[in-house]
Amino acid sequence: MITTIAFSAFAIASVIWMSVRTVRDHRAAMAERRGLLDDAARLLRDARITFSADHFPILAGSLADGRQIRAELIVDTMVCRRLPQLWLKLTLFETILRARPRIGALARPTGAEFYSIVHEMPRLLMPPPGDTALLMRGDGNASDRQVERTAAMFASLFSDRTLKEAAITPRGVRLVRQADEGQRAAHLLLRQARFSVTAIAPEIIRRTIAEAEVLSGFLADDEAVPGRRDFRKNAQRFLFQADPT
């Protein structure tokens, strides 16, 4: 009898301890998650950080030339038999609409990339040859020469296996790259998306911005679309649209 009571008390105490530990670990993870882009914020002018519904940070700021940058972190658990992915999605917004087509590429496509804008482009294009499987699409307004030049650029960019998506549009450019991969034990045993990264290194943000600037100046005339207004005054509105590009 005494043994049964003691065992029951131990079991109850263990459950309480595990519950308290789980809550404490969750709170610590949320606090750590919110600081992932703090170091990177120093790279931008007028940097400000807001938070998504799942407490991941969204960094917004500007470059020296006034163009706006938005960087956000996205958790992807959509693909079976693959560890959860933490993607860094960075968008560079032009101050004026550019006279260029929408064109982009997505690496190792599965069809489950809910964050992708390449999937929204209607025209299928021939991707460049290479070791990485690419889905290349556009809006149908690119010339053959533009498609060839962009394909060559993508072949170079996607030699980096961390790069998932690159897209050029009249309003801006976007890059998506892997920031971290989920912990195997947490995923297999607990079916949770836990990541080891405690901060996104400023070097990763700096490199991604540099690549975005190259893409921004890559296609055609780099001129404003005739009759369209200057977007500098309205940049903040575009920063917080779901898909501004």
Indicate residue ranges for each PLM-predicted region.
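Feature marks short, highly hydrophobic, charge-poor N-terminal signal-anchor/signal peptide-like helices
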Residues: 1-9
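Alpha-helical membrane-embedded segments
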Residues: 8-17
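Transmembrane-cytosolic junction motif
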Residues: 16-40
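Membrane-cytosol interface segments
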Residues: 21, 38-41, 45-51, 57-58
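Short, mixed-charge, low-aromatic patches
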Residues: 28-30, 46-47, 165-167
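Residues that form generic nucleotide/phosphate-binding pockets
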Residues: 39, 43, 72, 157, ...
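Charged, low-complexity intrinsically disordered regions
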Residues: 50-57, 62-64, 79-85, 91-245
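Long, continuous compositionally biased terminal/linker segments
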Residues: 68-77
